[in-house]
Amino acid sequence: MNFKYIIAVSFLIASAYARSVQNDEQSLSQRDVLEEESLREIRGIGGVLLSAGKAALKGLAKVLAEKYANGKRTAEEHEVMKRLEAVMRDLDSLDHPEEASERETRGFNQDEIAKEKRILGPVLGLVGNALGGLIKKIG
């Protein structure tokens, strides 16, 4: 009789353990699904913000390019135009990564890419300053 009791208790313990393992697996999979959904939402929000930022920068760069395109330019304005063109290329490569990778495979120099990325920060500062100046002149 003790033997049957030991077997019954062992069976109950094994089944309880199996159920707890199964519950743990289900809760982990549910947690993974929730984490994945929240990551998708974050990526979606980030994508929307990035798209809006790119569109605003492209529009601002086009306005500044049109302003500097008409008439004579000083050497500084010419340098600003070159930087704006580089920014436009960078922004276009973000919109069309396939074309950017094709350019790279056709021998687009990696040093030039790094140089343009280093220039992108100061150019955005120049664009901001130029926009601030335009707003002051208008206002």
From Swiss-Prot:
Major place of residence: secreted
Subcellular location: Secreted
Keywords assigned: Amidation, Amphibian defense peptide, Antibiotic, Antimicrobial, Cleavage on pair of basic residues, Cytolysis, Fungicide, Hemolysis, Secreted, Signal
InterPro entries reported in the protein's UniProt record: Bombinin (IPR007962)
In-chain residues carrying the UniProt-annotated modification Asparagine amide: 70
Pfam hit, one: Bombinin
Entry GO CC: extracellular region
Signal peptide feature range: 1-18
Tissue: Expressed by the skin glands.
Residue ranges of the propeptide: 19-43, 74-118
GO biological process: defense response to bacterium; defense response to fungus; killing of cells of another organism
Modified residues (Isoleucine amide): 138
Protein family (similarity comment): Belongs to the bombinin family.
Function in brief: Maximin-4 shows antibacterial activity against both Gram-positive and Gram-negative bacteria. It also shows antimicrobial activity against the fungus C.albicans, but not against A.flavus nor P.uticale. It has little hemolytic activity. It does not possess a significant cytotoxicity against tumor cell lines. It does not possess a significant anti-HIV activity. Maximin-H3 shows antibacterial activity against both Gram-positive and Gram-negative bacteria. It also shows antimicrobial activity against the fungus C.albicans. Shows strong hemolytic activity.
Descriptive protein name: Maximins 4/H3 type 4
Organism: Bombina maxima
